[in-house]
Amino acid sequence: MPTPEPVEQALVLLRERGDRVTEPRRRVLEALASLPGHPDVTEVHAAVQQLGPTHLATTYRALEHLCAAGILTHVHLDHAPARYHFAAQVTGVAHAHAACRGCGSVLDLPTEVLQPAREHLEARGYRPHLGHTALSVTCPDCAPADRRAGR
């Protein structure tokens, strides 16, 4: 059976939780689905505004609620705003992240790549949340400048 579109799957999961499907939440989901990659709140809000007038604080509250509900997740990048995307329970695919410290581009990584780190942490009693952070990397486009800077 094909996986439903992320917005429809997210709405189903919200209703199953007993959450209300408000217009701002729906707009945030639709906006996020329309954007490439891992947008930050400014990018999400700009896309939400295309769907109808919405205050920035409302967008923040909707993102916060959808993250708390496990519908969305966010990743923290070096000294930059959080980036948002649909959670694995919506897409059916868990992933980790690598973020270029030069340009900020984000690459999705299969979670298996971090399995040794997960096992190392779990053996010591830690519960890693590897999808919530990003490995700091230098992408191929930024590598020449990185080398010139001696990094």
What kind of region is each of these model predictions?
Residues P39-V48:
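Short acidic, hydrophobic short linear motifs in intrinsically disordered regions
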Residues A68-R151:
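Non-DNA-binding regulatory cores of transcription-related proteins
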Residues Y60-E64:
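Short, hydrophobic-biased segments on the C-terminal half of alpha helices
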Residues V21-E23, S34-D40:
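Short capping segments at the starts of secondary-structure elements
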Residues D40, H55-L56:
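Short coil turns linking two alpha-helices in DNA-binding domains
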Residues Q50-T54:
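Short, basic interhelical loop/turn and adjoining N-cap
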Residues P4-G18:
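Short, Lys/Arg-enriched N-terminal segment that forms or immediately precedes the first helix
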Residues R26-A31:
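Pre-recognition alpha-helix immediately N-terminal to the DNA-recognition helix
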